[in-house]
Amino acid sequence: MATGRTHRPATRSRGIPEATVARLPLYLRALTALSERSVPTVSSEELAAAAGVNSAKLRKDFSYLGSYGTRGVGYDVEYLVYQISRELGLTQDWPVVIVGIGNLGAALANYGGFASRGFRVAALIDADPAMAGKPVAGIPVQHTDELEKIIDGNGVSIGVIATPAGAAQQVCDRLVAAGVTSILNFAPTVLTVPDGVDVRKVDLSIELQILAFHEQRKAGEEAAAEGAIPAAASKESADKGPDGDVPAVMPA
């Protein structure tokens, strides 16, 4: 089976925008769910709703893939699953190493969704000598001294960093020097990498802060709406006459 070193997705060479690439996994997840239910075709409106995007944007995204659907029928679900999987490079095996096997790293190692999406956890690596040899998700943890040999021996091009912030840059440098060209960073720090290396940062605390912002805004809108009700009632009361009736408008 081919490995991540032998092929890279064609999305860049075909000029597919990064925003479109970021939405392709959303479409693939929705399409996979439809495929599992043996749904043969899907309209752009139905798929857009399932993926949580605008249908016009979905049609534009699919035009980059050369998929325009059939009027009155929609899109072929199985073909789209294959087409998007191919664009994302998921029709081959991608060996991945996870560095930092604390609580987060162990949780990532135990995540079953990697294998079903074409990502094979080739190795788990940690700097703690006491962790060496201990199995996590059925994979023995290896010491960071073995990092370069592990990368080379497994043809790894994707690395996951789940270390403390203080160790992340050094780990990143070693991964890149060993040949890793794509990094998923869970450490709460910004990594510096050379040209040609892609980094995707996942910061759960930032995502929670964004949710807190939206919660605060919703609370403010609700408070403003509740304050508007008494104001409207006061105005209505002021408009009424001494007997509680609204005065008639006299003709000019």
UniProtKB/Swiss-Prot annotation:
InterPro entries named among the record's database cross-references: CoA-bd, NAD(P)-bd_dom_sf, Rex_DNA-bd_C_dom, Tscrpt_rep_Rex, WH-like_DNA-bd_sf, WH_DNA-bd_sf
Keyword set includes Cytoplasm: yes
Binding region for DNA: 26-65
Disulfide bonds: none
Gene Ontology molecular function terms on file: DNA binding; DNA-binding transcription factor activity
Key words of the record: Cytoplasm, DNA-binding, NAD, Repressor, Transcription, Transcription regulation
GO terms under cellular component: cytoplasm
SMART domains: CoA_binding
Main localization, broad class: cytoplasm
Location(s) in or outside the cell: Cytoplasm
Record GO biological process: negative regulation of DNA-templated transcription; response to redox state
Spans annotated as Disordered: 222-252
List of residues binding NAD(+): G100, I101, G102, N103, L104, G105
Function: Modulates transcription in response to changes in cellular NADH/NAD(+) redox state.
Assembly and binders: Homodimer.
Family per similarity comment: Belongs to the transcriptional regulatory Rex family.
Protein name: Redox-sensing transcriptional repressor Rex
